[in-house]
Amino acid sequence: MTKVVVCALYKFVSLPHFESIRAPLLAMMEQAEIKGTLLLASEGINGTVAGTQEAIEALLVWLNGQNGLDNIVHKLSFDDEMPFYRTKVKLKNEIVTMGVEGIDPLKVVGTYVKPQDWNALISDPDVILVDTRNDYEVQIGTFKNAVNPVTETFREFPEYVKQNLDPAKHKKVAMFCTGGIRCEKSTAYLKEQGFDEVYHLEGGILKYLEEVKAEESLWEGECFVFDNRVAVNHDLKKGQYDQCNACRMPITEVEKQSPAYVQGVSCPHCIDKISDEQRKRFVERERQVNLAKARNEAHIGSDVNQVIEARREKKEAQRRLAAEKNNAKKSQVL
């Protein structure tokens, strides 16, 4: 069986004409039968895609030939099945959304630490180790002694820093994320806030798992990934977790035995949070998914990435609307 190559990539680079890249990039991906999502913005490119080894190599060569997109940071892993259902290239304001204006990793960023040197750094008692990922990601795996900020989205990370970290007290801060991109912005943000020694795991967790032997590793658990594999183990192979199609939380086989778990409808994490209307919608979606499977077709309802992204976009739209209303009220007062 031909292995599917999964490629996570990103690069912060000034792309003033990023809109013009979308069409030829999408055409190249479709021709090579590459699936997944790439984001383009004026600050660079980010995303995860999958295809044959030849297709992924062709994509990297194609990107390398585009002005500014050479030498892209990328990590490869492998799967027996295609983890995506769609091919998408999206235009965004940011390639990773922190929501803080003026943060530019091209101008200032933390000190990169190679995976081989990471254990020594985080074993230093003077270093505070912070996991920049969301809480549901942290729950299934993290580094030994890492602090969990308990955030739902990356937008909440700046507030966590304001409330919990102090440049005068926390002299050395080390941070990590899945592939490294969130730390590009989080370390840049900390530097802007006056923190002096700020460190960043180069290549993220995925690069660490790739290069550090399991017997020497300080990683505990599995690493959440934003595709249908849900999580990967230390060998970068699909882990033991599944995902609830209702709330998107990772779930174990034990949790799937719970009366609260209904495939595509609910799980122990969300059984008390979903409304009757949502439940009916999820039941119908699951019915459509099963019909599509019976016809040997992919159904939009089973596309994990699309559901996650839609939920995030909805939350961001709600935040923007709330901010606009708040600004309008302030203007009326003035």
Swiss-Prot record:
Pfam families: Rhodanese, UPF0176_N. Its EC number is 1.14.-.-. Coiled coil: none annotated. InterPro entries: Rhodanese-like_dom, Rhodanese-like_dom_sf, TrhO, TRHO_N. It comes from the Bacteria. GO terms for biological process: tRNA modification. The keyword tRNA processing applies. Belongs to the TrhO family. Residues 123-217 form the Rhodanese domain. This is tRNA uridine(34) hydroxylase. SMART domains: RHOD. It catalyses: uridine(34) in tRNA + AH2 + O2 = 5-hydroxyuridine(34) in tRNA + A + H2O. Keywords: Oxidoreductase, tRNA processing. It comes from Shewanella baltica (strain OS223). One of its GO terms (molecular function) is oxidoreductase activity, acting on paired donors, with incorporation or reduction of molecular oxygen. Catalyzes oxygen-dependent 5-hydroxyuridine (ho5U) modification at position 34 in tRNAs. NCBIfam families: PRK00142.1-4 (NF001136).
